[in-house]
């Protein structure tokens, strides 16, 4: 990718910063997570949570959601203009769980959004600290990616459930900025664009007038974000076609679906970063760790280190398996929902199983669930090794855009070969190469056909011992190739419902 020089690193996107050197980036990312930690500690004080209750991931999620809701300007404005029954637009809240006489109790709390904003700003040196808010959104998005399936949403937009490995970040709110755009998968961007085009088909005023002009700008910006994720000239040229279309319609939807399919072999570059629950940063700050002084990176050893010595708990339903619950959070913390299970298992040091074999449901507990039978257990979030997070699709060499890894979107920059059955994927490309994008389609199909399963991605990259913080001795794992590496195999997870 020749354009590397013009790109800001994730950390710069994440902190809204201009060009900075590595030390400055580490410091500003440190300032960001330190602010989240200070905010969390303050909220625990406000709510009088015990140490144990403050380490409960459900409480962390409620507190994170409250601050995100307090800063959601668009929704706040909407709520004030459309007062709905029983919703106070100025308040936010959620369930907080407390330990009383050996049992867990649910308490619904309500806070002024203004008060939450004040506490957040106070924890962030008086600033709005949007970067920290985005960071929390990405953690929630990673948790959703690991917990829920999006088959319904895929089918609704005319895509194929087999494209689920392209759906990273599909539940991120639109306001998540550049850092959010970086972690969205190709399928997520395609889906957002298709929804937009469909609205334009059904509502003739969608692209017209002053509003329509703004819509058009948003459409072109989304096209450019998606174009930037593709690594081959033909895919990018096709995106130019979609972007420049006078009035986008079914032809563009066809092109986008074709591109999404092609991304199963010619993978897009999607960023991965380890975003941890607020309570983890809170614990570290409370123990006297100075993130800004020490510096922090979302794509290196730091999150692994932090998780090695953080004790976090989760409420657990009677029939759930605590080890499976831990796996979900571990995957979410490292943004590894779409990673090859062989790679994840090696790094984690315990077997990571496909979602179809997990006996656990989501983390949020519905208000009608019985608390009597609720227990809590420690989440096992430690790892055996650490590895650098990648921002590429795992293509072996950029010159001839070879195959990225199929049915997964690599998270860790670790050498692996590609377990894929090309015939299965090529079957999705029956015929249709006519129309104005025919030459590009032909070229893309040709590249896909020449992709070889025996290719190796991330050549020579390995994992590192946790004592090797400078990443000096890569250990290149060898994998059993007979195993299918996809997490979504035999999927039976719940659908994500907003």
UniProtKB/Swiss-Prot annotation:
MF term (GO), any: RNA binding
Short sequence motif Unconventional nuclear localization signal: positions: 1-18
Record region (Disordered): 1-21
Gene Ontology, cellular component aspect: helical viral capsid; host cell; host cell nucleus; ribonucleoprotein complex; viral nucleocapsid
Record gene name: NP
SUBUNIT field: Homomultimerizes to form the nucleocapsid. May bind host exportin-1/XPO1. Binds to viral genomic RNA. Protein-RNA contacts are mediated by a combination of electrostatic interactions between positively charged residues and the phosphate backbone and planar interactions between aromatic side chains and bases.
Motif (Bipartite nuclear localization signal): 198-216
Posttranslational mods: Late in virus-infected cells, may be cleaved from a 56-kDa protein to a 53-kDa protein by a cellular caspase. This cleavage might be a marker for the onset of apoptosis in infected cells or have a specific function in virus host interaction.
Protein name, UniProt field: Nucleoprotein
Keywords tagged on the record: Capsid protein, Helical capsid protein, Host nucleus, Host-virus interaction, Ribonucleoprotein, RNA-binding, Viral nucleoprotein, Viral penetration into host nucleus, Virion, Virus entry into host cell
GO terms for biological process, alphabetical: symbiont entry into host cell; viral penetration into host nucleus
Family indicated by similarity: Belongs to the influenza viruses nucleoprotein family.
Compartmental location: Virion; Host nucleus
């Amino acid at each position: 990718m020749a354009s590397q020089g013009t790109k800001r690193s994730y950390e710069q996107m994440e902190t809204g910063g201009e060009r900075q050197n590595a030390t400055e980036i580490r410091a500003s990312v440190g300032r960001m997570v330190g602010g989240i930690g200070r905010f969390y500690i303050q909220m625990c004080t406000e709510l009088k949570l015990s140490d144990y209750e403050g380490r409960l991931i459900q409480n962390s999620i409620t507190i994170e959601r409250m601050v995100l809701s307090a800063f959601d300007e668009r929704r706040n404005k909407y709520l004030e203009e459309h007062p709905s029954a029983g919703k106070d637009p100025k308040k936010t809240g959620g369930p907080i769980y407390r330990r009383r006489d050996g049992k867990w109790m649910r308490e619904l709390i309500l806070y002024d959004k203004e008060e939450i904003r004040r506490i957040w700003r106070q924890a962030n040196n008086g600033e709005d600290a949007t970067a920290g808010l985005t960071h929390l959104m990405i953690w929630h998005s990673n948790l959703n990616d690991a917990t829920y399936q999006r088959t319904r949403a895929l089918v609704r937009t005319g895509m194929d459930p087999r494209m689920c490995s392209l759906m990273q970040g599909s539940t991120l709110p639109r306001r998540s900025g550049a850092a959010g755009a970086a972690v969205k998968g190709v399928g997520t961007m395609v889906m957002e664009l298709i929804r937009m085009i469909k609205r334009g088909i059904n509502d003739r005023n969608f692209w017209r007038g002053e509003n329509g002009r703004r819509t058009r700008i948003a459409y072109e910006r989304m096209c450019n974000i998606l174009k930037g994720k593709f690594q081959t000239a033909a895919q990018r040229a096709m995106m130019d076609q979609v972007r420049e279309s006078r009035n986008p319609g079914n032809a563009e939807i066809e092109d986008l679906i074709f591109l999404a399919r092609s991304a199963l072999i010619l993978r897009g570059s999607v960023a991965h970063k380890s975003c941890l629950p607020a309570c983890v940063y809170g614990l570290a700050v409370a123990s006297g760790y100075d993130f800004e002084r020490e510096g922090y990176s979302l794509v290196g050893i730091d999150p692994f280190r932090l998780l090695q010595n953080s004790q976090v708990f989760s409420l657990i339903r009677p029939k759930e398996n605590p080890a499976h619950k831990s796996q979900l959070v571990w995957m979410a913390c490292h943004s590894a929902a779409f990673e090859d299970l062989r790679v994840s298992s090696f790094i984690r040091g315990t077997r990571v199983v496909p979602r179809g074999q997990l006996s656990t449901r989501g983390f949020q507990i519905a208000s009608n669930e019985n608390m009597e039978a609720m227990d809590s257990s420690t989440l096992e979030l430690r790892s055996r090794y650490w590895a650098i997070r990648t921002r590429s699709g795992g293509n072996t060499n950029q010159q001839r855009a070879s195959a990225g890894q199929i049915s997964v979107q690599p998270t860790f920059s670790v050498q692996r070969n590609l377990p894929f059955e090309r015939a299965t994927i090529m079957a999705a490309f029956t015929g249709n190469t006519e129309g104005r994008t025919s030459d590009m389609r032909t070229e893309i199909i040709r590249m896909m056909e020449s992709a070889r399963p025996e290719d190796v991605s991330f050549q020579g990259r390995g994992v590192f011992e946790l004592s090797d913080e400078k990443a000096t001795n890569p250990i290149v794992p060898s994998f059993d190739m007979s195993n299918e590496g996809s997490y979504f195999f035999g999927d039976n997870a719940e659908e994500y419902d907003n």
